[in-house]
Amino acid sequence: MLGFLKKIFDHENKELKKFKLIADEVFELDDKYKKMTDKQLQGCTNKLKKRLKDGETVDDILPDAFAVAREAAYRVIGEKPFYVQVLGALAIHFGNIAEMKTGEGKTLTCVMPAYLNALTEKGVHVVTVNEYLATRDAEWMGQIYRFLGLTVAVNLREMSSKEKKEAYNCDILYSTNNELGFDYLRDNMVVNAEDRVQRPLHFAIIDEVDSVLIDEARTPLIISGGVMKSANLYKDADRFVKTLRENEDYTIDEKTKDITLTDQGTEKGEKYFRIANLYDIEHSALVHHVNQALKANYTMHNDVDYVVQEGKVVIVDQFTGRLMPGRAFSDGLHQAIEAKENVEIEEETKTLATITFQNYFRMYEKLSGMTGTAKTEEEEFRNIYNMYVIEIPTNLPVIRVDAADLIYSTKEEKYKAIIAEIKRRHEKGQPVLVGTIAIETNELLSSMLKKAHIKHEILNAKNHAREAEIIAKAGEKGSVTIATNMAGRGTDIKLGEGVKELGGLCVIGTERHESRRIDNQLRGRSGRQGDPGYSQFFVSFEDELMVRFGTDRFKSILEMAGLDSERNMRSRTITRSVETAQKRVEGNNFDARKHLLQYDDVMGKHREIMYARRNEILDNEDVHNYVINTMKELIELLVRRHTNEHGVILEADCNEIVEYVNENLLNNSNLKLSEILNKEINDIIDVIQNKVLKEYEEKIKELPDEIRKDFEKAISLQVIDNYWMEHINTMDHLREGVSLRGYANEDPLQAYIREGFELFDKMLDNICKDTTLYLLKAEIRQNLQAKQVKGSTNEAKEQGVKKTIKKGKKIGRNDMCPCGSGKKYKQCCGK
């Protein structure tokens, strides 16, 4: 660990020295661009683009581009980036994370690397955590880019595909991380190439990068569809777990929050559901629902993890305190919470497409970020994203006072002390910002302040509409603001008139968060740009972090100090112990994210192959060669699977091949046993391929070219999409299933990789088979207009394929229906 830290420290010093030399070059060019007229300055953009086209690199033109952007910023918005902002911009350009304290001007810093990299005409994405910030920054900084002749857009959720495509084609795009990820998934579900909106992913600058790549790393983006009926099972599981007792029927690991049934709880489950063995393979769905019900009832808390609004369960973002409408806990946990809260259970849906931010952002050619707090997570950024954290010096020294924690025995005494401290500061007019980690604490303190007749603003997930306005006024004289976590992050708190003389903004933390980074973010709201400020955390031994990691040793320290319910103490020893506990939690969380990534990387490889195949079909105007090769591949697979270890096909196997080919691949002719018996394998393959392909070519020769092209493309995409959707769900179940392999001394991850690729290979074979069968069996309406086949895959299936079966051919009840529905014949046209 010490070696790793030394390596990081040495690298950071080396990089900063390099950046300072380049920054000096940028400042030396100041006079050159100051003297230019607006028209001359605006003409620099085309000159810089020409230098790139003539063979110079982005790094070659960097000093000039940065100097141009600085001068343009001054002329357009009246602000010229400081020297430290140029250092931050250099850190970003070279693919690092610039750690810049609150108020140091990250938004303006971003303009220089965004302008420089946009000159390549490959597009730059500036990523923010919400649409308010994306819109604000696009409008504010967009003035500078437009002055310099670049195009700028903001990517919003409600935009049409056409509007999104236009936005992505701009030089610089401001967007939320969620919208970028969802657009990527949607692009890989379209059935017409022109409906895709994204360009190749070139360069992303992520604002509040720790929030996006760390806090949200474990939350996958999911596009769902296709309802699965299981509401009753959730209700049954919920009723059962409500009969259980902690430690007797189930146990909770306080450190990891894992919850499991005891042997006694398992026996109760078997009696309750009247089954012999709860963990029998046939009851795997029931076990899953019981596990989710346990989590919902005993580890997920109303007003902390979620709120219930208008009969709906809405997620609360644990790191910002914001509501996340439209998002759902995955894997059935959302439905389990709905059962717990006795609200309508929304039908569980199948996952159509999914990706984590970890895998999405690693697809960019170059990735960088900026934040006020990333140093504590440097190892993770380095290992997973290959980014260093460069700590940028402040423009003015930080003079904020960070007091040692005040320790109390109980929450009750702690809250009384917080109210007393707020009252004392409020009486002299000093603004106070109170940070809480849960909505319930937020509302409790608000009610206590009301009783104390202290006027205040409250900001949490239930009251976020005025977020920016409330936070912006938090530095006014006499203001008191209570906010969950980092609500309002991205909005500066500027001090009102006369506040500096009162000591600046006072920040009070009501308890330590499990992440030091979140605590540092709260402290960082005070003391911006050399302003005075004060921060203080109040801690009790009833706080969650202390309960999870506190020890009797701490309590003995308190007893020795004579601490009782009426007193408090400041203890650097306990503060250090709290930070040690936080480091342990951070370590656990890092391990969990790394663990998730190891599993997601397996799916990532599958996704990469499938999306590449899908895009190849989409980008080809004519996929006839693809479908012919698919048919050939199926026939080769068929023959080789009937070949024994000596490379011989026995007569019995030849009979099976003949039966399969005649039943599934030929309509107007037959394969005879004599044509393949006692022949070489390659000759057998050739005979069958020639017969099948001849019949297919005969079938499509009368079709207009456009009809044939659209039909082949629609079927090819439909089969891939159906199987990919099933594969996602199969891999989810596999992941859940391998988790217990560790008890049998088998590495669950290795089992997941091995069995996952077996499933993937099987899926590719099935895609090959179904594509062939649908194309051979489907009868196409020859009077169909080409445009009717286009649209969604489902439309292509309904409009381009007649739901009729050729007379004279027997279709097995369990065979796939040749109409192209993807269902078995007995469940479709054979009803």
Which residues are covered by each model-predicted region?
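Hydrophobic, well-ordered secondary-structure elements that form the walls
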Residues: 434, 482, 724, 760, ...
